[in-house]
Amino acid sequence: LGDVYKRQGYGGSCFPKDTKALNFQSDHAGVKLKTVKATIDVNREQRIKLIDKARRFFPDFRGVRVAIIGLTFKPGTDDLREAPAKQNIDILLNEGASVIAWDPLGVENFRKRYPDCAINFAENIDEALTDADVCFIMTEWEKIVEYPLDNYKKYMRRPLVFDGRNCYKLSEVEKHEIFYDSIGRKIVDTL
């Protein structure tokens, strides 16, 4: 994965299940596949990396309005299996955050799978960002990749953006008044 897959972890129905199965089978056979175990462990850590990064601004998230952009594990699907969004949302809610989420396909599936999850859903990205203290990008939907960077400053209280999918080119981000932290790349702070 390494440099090829600089993101906040993997999800879906196959790779997480397959790595866990391979790890189980190797343990059962008395063979320790350290790289497989390390992959599983690092993926678990990567899934909440954005929250860890945001703690420089918010030691806890009590009273913080959080925009979650993208709920699914990848674009083009409503599949939420092993998607990082749910784990992050749980942490944020447990710490007292107010969460509003947007996803073009995943909202209805999210509501069905997690009916007791106390978050709000936005009709569009603008609505999700309105008055948000921080934004976490969890899925690299085309609508996000093409979303105008100026709108983060326009709609958010302070444009603090943590991108788990590296949706934007850093050279483009640098042209806007924004704090932008992504995975495996330098921080852009033009505030």
Regions found by a protein language model. Name each.
Residues D3-L191:
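Structural/interface elements that position substrates and couple domains in central-metabolism enzymes
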